[in-house]
Amino acid sequence: MTEMVPAWVEGRLMPVEKLEAHQRGLRHMAISVFVMAGEAVLIQRRAAGKYHTPGLWANTCCTHPRWGEEAADCAVRRLREELGITGLVTVFADRVEYRADVGNGLIEHEVVDIFVAEAPSDLPVNPDPEEVWETRWVDLTDLAREVKEHPERFTPWLRIYLAEHMERIFGKLRVVQ
C-alpha cells in the first residue's frame, strides 16, 4: 500500500508518496509525541528495518499524517500502532520546522506538530517490533545530557528538539539549564 502524506509541491499542499517526499526533500507535515511520567520521558529505539535512521533513539513516537488526517488524530493513532498505548490525552505543545539529512539520500524537511501526553509511570507499553526495537524511560535532564554527549545515538529530529526547542515543547519548569 502506498502511503500518501501532505507535502508542499510548488507552494501547494498536496498528497505525495511518503518515500518520494523524503527522496526529493519536500517540505511535508509530521507529528511527534512525547509521553511523560513526571520528569521522565518515554523514548524509543527505532527498529533495525526502518528505511531511515534505524537503531537510533527517538522521542516516544513520530510519523506523518495521512493525506486528510488531522495531526491530533495521527498522534493518537501512532501511539496505539507503534507502542500499543491507548487512553492518553495528547496536548499540542509546539510546531517546529526543520530540515535534516537522514542518510541513504533521504531528507526530512518537516513541519512538525509536537504533542505531549502525561502518563502514569506504570503505563503498559507493547511495541510493534516492525517499528520499535526497544523503549525506555529516562529523566528529561539526563536525556538532554545524553544527546549532547552522544549525538550519534539519536535521531536528527530529537537532537534538534532538545537543542533548539526545549522550553517551547516542555515548558519553563522542565528546561535544562
Swiss-Prot record:
Cofactor needs: Mg(2+); Mn(2+)
Binding-site list for Mg(2+): E82
Coiled coil: none
PROSITE patterns: NUDIX
Its EC number(s): 5.3.3.2
Domain Nudix hydrolase: 26-160
InterPro entries assigned to the protein according to its UniProt record, in alphabetical order: Idi_bact (IPR056375), IsopentenylPP_isomerase_typ1 (IPR011876), NUDIX_hydrolase-like_dom_sf (IPR015797), NUDIX_hydrolase_dom (IPR000086)
Annotated Gene Ontology cellular component terms: cytoplasm
CDD domains hit by this protein: NUDIX_IPP_Isomerase (cd02885)
Cofactor note: Binds 1 Mg(2+) ion per subunit. The magnesium ion binds only when substrate is bound. Binds 1 Mn(2+) ion per subunit.
Superkingdom classification of source: Bacteria
Molecular function in Gene Ontology: isopentenyl-diphosphate delta-isomerase activity; metal ion binding
Binding positions (Mn(2+)): H22, H28, H64, E108, E110
Pathway: Isoprenoid biosynthesis; dimethylallyl diphosphate biosynthesis; dimethylallyl diphosphate from isopentenyl diphosphate: step 1/1; Porphyrin-containing compound metabolism; chlorophyll biosynthesis
Active site (catalytic residues): C62, E110
An example Gene Ontology biological process: dimethylallyl diphosphate biosynthetic process
Keywords assigned: Chlorophyll biosynthesis, Cytoplasm, Isomerase, Isoprene biosynthesis, Magnesium, Manganese, Metal-binding, Photosynthesis
One Pfam family matching this protein: NUDIX
Catalytic activity line of the entry: isopentenyl diphosphate = dimethylallyl diphosphate
Gene3D superfamilies cross-referenced by the UniProt entry: Nucleoside Triphosphate Pyrophosphohydrolase
Family to which this protein belongs: Belongs to the IPP isomerase type 1 family.
PANTHER family in the record: ISOPENTENYL-DIPHOSPHATE DELTA-ISOMERASE (PTHR10885:SF0)
Function (record text): Catalyzes the 1,3-allylic rearrangement of the homoallylic substrate isopentenyl (IPP) to its highly electrophilic allylic isomer, dimethylallyl diphosphate (DMAPP).
Cited HAMAP family: Idi
The name this protein goes by in its record: Isopentenyl-diphosphate Delta-isomerase
Organism: Cereibacter sphaeroides (strain KD131 / KCTC 12085)
